[in-house]
Amino acid sequence: MFPMLNGFMNYGQQTVRAARYIGQSFMITLSHTNRLPVTIQYPYEKSITSERFRGRIHFEFDKCIACEVCVRVCPIDLPVVDWRLETDIRKKRLLNYSIDFGICIFCGNCVEYCPTNCLSMTEEYELSTYDRHELNYNQISLGRLPMSVIGDYTIQTIMNSTQMKIAMDKSLDSRTITNY
């Protein structure tokens, strides 16, 4: 009789343990219901990039003095700077400037060390093409500013998690609680 009683007790303990595991997993599932979805519907929804995002490089031809600092600080010597020395004014004259984004590692050294700030990072990250030679941008295509994701009315913008935290902190700071 005792072995049968022990069998029922073991069965009861196993049932309670199984119910506890099911309850724990159900609680984990319920904790995920208030979270926002991780994925977005990409062509129609775009995530807002952070302030320090390193996208395509923007180049301003008129500011460049052809000093080639960007070439020297680039880990892969990527920017191609063509210039001619004007002997009458003893200055370099920039003829052509190009960057191949198929090779660029987007480190940002060229932007950081440029003495005239003619280079800047944009928020453009859609650089995919069918031909890799289209990724070689000259001074004309580098000079075009991309349309801002926020300014495009056909696309729904979605804030990422850090931007949502910043927005929540700002809204909490702006409220004042008074007791009457």
Swiss-Prot record:
Entry's localization field: Plastid, Chloroplast thylakoid membrane
Domain 4Fe-4S ferredoxin-type: 55-84, 95-124
MF annotations from Gene Ontology: 4 iron, 4 sulfur cluster binding; iron ion binding; NADH dehydrogenase (ubiquinone) activity; quinone binding
Co-factor binding details: Binds 2 [4Fe-4S] clusters per subunit.
Annotated EC: 7.1.1.-
Keywords: 4Fe-4S, Chloroplast, Iron, Iron-sulfur, Membrane, Metal-binding, NAD, NADP, Plastid, Plastoquinone, Quinone, Repeat, Thylakoid, Translocase
Segment forming the signal sequence: none
Membrane topology summary: Peripheral membrane protein
Binding site for [4Fe-4S] cluster 1: C64, C67, C70, C114
Pfam families: Fer4_7 (PF12838)
Catalytic activity: a plastoquinone + NADH + (n+1) H(+)(in) = a plastoquinol + NAD(+) + n H(+)(out); a plastoquinone + NADPH + (n+1) H(+)(in) = a plastoquinol + NADP(+) + n H(+)(out)
Residues binding [4Fe-4S] cluster 2: C74, C104, C107, C110
One annotated GO biological process: photosynthesis, light reaction
Required co-factors: [4Fe-4S] cluster
Disulfide-bond pairs as recorded: none
InterPro entries reported for this sequence: 4Fe4S_Fe-S-bd (IPR017896), 4Fe4S_Fe_S_CS (IPR017900), NADH_quinone_OxRdtase_chainI (IPR010226), NDHI (IPR004497)
Keyword presence, Iron: yes
Reported function: NDH shuttles electrons from NAD(P)H:plastoquinone, via FMN and iron-sulfur (Fe-S) centers, to quinones in the photosynthetic chain and possibly in a chloroplast respiratory chain. The immediate electron acceptor for the enzyme in this species is believed to be plastoquinone. Couples the redox reaction to proton translocation, and thus conserves the redox energy in a proton gradient.
Subunit structure, as described in the record: NDH is composed of at least 16 different subunits, 5 of which are encoded in the nucleus.
PANTHER family xrefs: NAD(P)H-QUINONE OXIDOREDUCTASE SUBUNIT I, CHLOROPLASTIC
Family assignment from sequence similarity: Belongs to the complex I 23 kDa subunit family.
Protein known as: NAD(P)H-quinone oxidoreductase subunit I, chloroplastic
Lineage of producing organism: Eukaryota, Viridiplantae, Streptophyta, Embryophyta, Tracheophyta
Gene, per the UniProt record: ndhI
